[in-house]
Amino acid sequence: MSHSVKIYDTCIGCTQCVRACPTDVLEMIPWDGCKAKQIAPAPRTEDCVGCKRCESACPTDFLSVRVYLWHETTRSMGLAY
C-alpha cells in the first residue's frame, strides 16, 4: 500500500526526517519554498512503510513532515467504504 508523505514549508532543513527513515524514502533537495532553502521530498512513496519515524524526528512545532496512511488518505477523499 502506498502512503502519502507531505513536506510543509515549515521545514528547517535539519535532515532529522531523512536520517530517521528506515526505507530511505526522503532526500534533501534545494527548494526556495521553505525556510531552509531545501526540503525532503518523497520521491519513493511506494517504499513508505507508514512507521511515521520521520514525524517523530521532526523538531519543528508544526510537524514539517506528515505521513498519511493509505486508509487516512482514502477516508479524507471520501473513498472509504
From Swiss-Prot:
Q: Which GO terms describe its molecular function?
A: 4 iron, 4 sulfur cluster binding; electron transfer activity; metal ion binding; oxidoreductase activity
How would you describe this protein's topology in the membrane? Answer: Peripheral membrane protein
Q: What is its EC number?
A: 1.97.1.12
The entry marks the following residues as binding [4Fe-4S] cluster 2, namely 21, 48, 51, 54
Q: Which cofactor does it need?
A: [4Fe-4S] cluster
Q: Where in the cell is it found?
A: Plastid, Chloroplast thylakoid membrane
The reaction(s) catalysed by this protein are:
reduced [plastocyanin] + hnu + oxidized [2Fe-2S]-[ferredoxin] = oxidized [plastocyanin] + reduced [2Fe-2S]-[ferredoxin]
The UniProt entry, under PROSITE patterns, shows:
4FE4S_FER_1, 4FE4S_FER_2
**Keywords in alphabetical order:** 4Fe-4S, Chloroplast, Electron transport, Iron, Iron-sulfur, Membrane, Metal-binding, Oxidoreductase, Photosynthesis, Photosystem I, Plastid, Repeat, Thylakoid, Transport
The GO cellular component terms are: chloroplast thylakoid membrane; photosystem I
The answer to keyword Membrane applying to this record is yes
- CC cofactor note: Binds 2 [4Fe-4S] clusters. Cluster 2 is most probably the spectroscopically characterized electron acceptor FA and cluster 1 is most probably FB.
Alphabetical GO biological process terms: photosynthetic electron transport in photosystem I
Q: Which Pfam families match?
A: Fer4_21
Q: What do we know about how this protein assembles, alone or with others?
A: The eukaryotic PSI reaction center is composed of at least 11 subunits.
Q: What is this protein called?
A: Photosystem I iron-sulfur center
Q: Which organism is it from?
A: Liriodendron tulipifera
Its ancestry begins with: Eukaryota, Viridiplantae, Streptophyta, Embryophyta, Tracheophyta
